[in-house]
From Swiss-Prot:
It comes from Ruegeria pomeroyi (strain ATCC 700808 / DSM 15171 / DSS-3). Transmembrane segments: none annotated. This is Bifunctional enzyme IspD/IspF. One of its GO terms (molecular function) is 2-C-methyl-D-erythritol 4-phosphate cytidylyltransferase activity. Residues 1-221 are annotated as: 2-C-methyl-D-erythritol 4-phosphate cytidylyltransferase. SUPFAM superfamilies: IpsF-like (SSF69765), Nucleotide-diphospho-sugar transferases (SSF53448). The gene is ispDF. The lineage of its organism: Bacteria, Pseudomonadati, Pseudomonadota, Alphaproteobacteria, Rhodobacterales. The record marks R148, K201 as: Positions MEP for the nucleophilic attack. Pfam families: IspD, YgbB. The record marks R15, K22, H254, T353 as: Transition state stabilizer.
Length: 377
């Protein structure tokens, strides 16, 4: 079976305050949307659709370089979901999860329970049994009570067999509160799986503090360091952090000798306790002769994600007298961010000298140091 997830991120989120839609606000060092997307970086999920508001131009540009499938938001939530479903047409999807971007604390256990329930039912969703007394009210006064037995607070992801929910949305007149209501209108059976009190939906400003507490209590943070050095040799340019920089000499190495990218790659491997580039790409193997270092970095990033981690930020320092790094630093930052699928503000590239001491001070080569921070929610 082929499973997809649709992350609905086209809302404006005005009740949460902050001046920007809540999915783009910071939360525990990252954006809400970043946390939510990472929750669905699971082996069982082969495709992820991110539904974006048409006016979120920066987000469209940022995610266009990632493996995500992008879809435009509709005039309401149902329209956004339909656009997300349409983006999966022809991909052979059998199961689909539909999730609100404003639920960044959803657990892998909840996602797995929904997927498992779809083996026996055309629909499944997490729900929390209502335990509080329920009132009705008007003008600040209690006007009555309601029986709470059999009542559940709905959560996401709400999962469905793909063809069934596509047909249900096509037939629905609109105005549904969620996708379970759409499914029920089409007479689909929807199983209730246990919800999670921590799977809150960020709606109001105070919800950010609670979500941050939840994320930080289980967060696994790893740090890795990388160091590399290459000597100068004949040439007319060097490649640093993926950017070709004119110089009167080149750097010598088995691959393209990108000392900065090598240090960052080793920092990622180090955080995972996976050795260094040489373990994964032995210099004794001729197939890596002259290879682009992007290959190594992508491998490290893929390994990070396969282990359930996300790259929080990267810091790389280049040590050399020449060439001058400053004029190229922003371009290097953007290129590294592109390769790793990060926003540029999470990648730092800077330079220093050794005050003319040592081999870098004698302009015999370039050294690079890097630190990588990984997080697992």
């Amino acid at each position: 079976m082929t499973t997809a997830a649709i992350i609905v991120a086209a809302g404006r989120g005005t009740r949460a305050g902050g001046g920007v839609p809540k999915q783009w606000r910071p939360l525990a060092g990252r954006r809400v949307a970043d946390w939510t997307l990472d929750r669905f970086a699971l082996r069982q999920i082969t495709h992820v659709v991110l539904v974006l508001h048409p006016e979120d131009h920066d987000a469209w540009d940022e995610f266009a370089t990632t493996p995500l499938i992008l879809a435009p938001g509709g005039s309401d939530r149902a329209g956004s979901v339909r656009n997300g479903l349409a983006a999966l047409d022809g991909l052979g999807i059998t199961k689909v999860l539909i999730h609100d971007v404003a639920r960044p604390c959803v657990s892998a256990a909840t996602i797995g329970a929904v997927l498992d329930a779809l083996d026996a039912h055309p629909g499944a969703a997490p729900g929390l049994a209502v335990t509080d007394a329920l009132w009705t009210g008007a003008e600040g006064l209690v006007t009555g009570t309601r029986e709470r037995d059999g009542l559940f607070a709905a959560q996401t992801p709400q999962g469905f067999r793909y063809d069934a929910i596509v047909a249900a949305h096509a037939a629905h007149p609109g105005g549904a509160a969620d996708d379970v209501e759409v499914a029920r209108a089409a007479e689909l059976t929807v199983a209730i799986v246990p919800g999670d009190p921590d799977n809150l939906k960020i709606t109001r400003a105070e919800d950010f503090a609670r979500a941050e507490r939840i994320l930080r209590q289980d967060m696994d943070v790893r740090l890795g360091n990388g160091y590399d050095v290459h000597r100068f040799g004949p040439g007319d340019h060097v490649i640093l952090c993926g950017i070709k920089v004119p110089h009167d000499r080149g750097l010598q190495g088995h691959s393209d000798a990108d000392v900065g990218m090598h240090a960052v790659t080793d920092a990622l491997y180090g955080a995972l306790v996976e050795g260094d580039i040489g373990r994964h790409f032995p210099p004794s193997d001729p197939q890596w002769k002259g290879a682009a270092s992007e290959i190594f970095l992508r491998h490290a990033v893929d390994l990070v994600r396969a282990r359930g981690f996300a790259v929080s930020n990267i810091d790389c320092t280049l040590v050399c007298e020449y060439p001058k790094i400053g004029p190229h630093a922003l371009e290097m930052q953007a290129e590294m961010a592109r390769i790793m699928g990060l926003e540029a503000s999470r990648v730092s590239v800077k330079a220093t000298t050794s005050e003319r001491l040592g081999f870098t001070g004698r302009s015999e080569g370039i050294a690079a140091l890097a630190t990588a921070c990984l997080v697992k929610p």
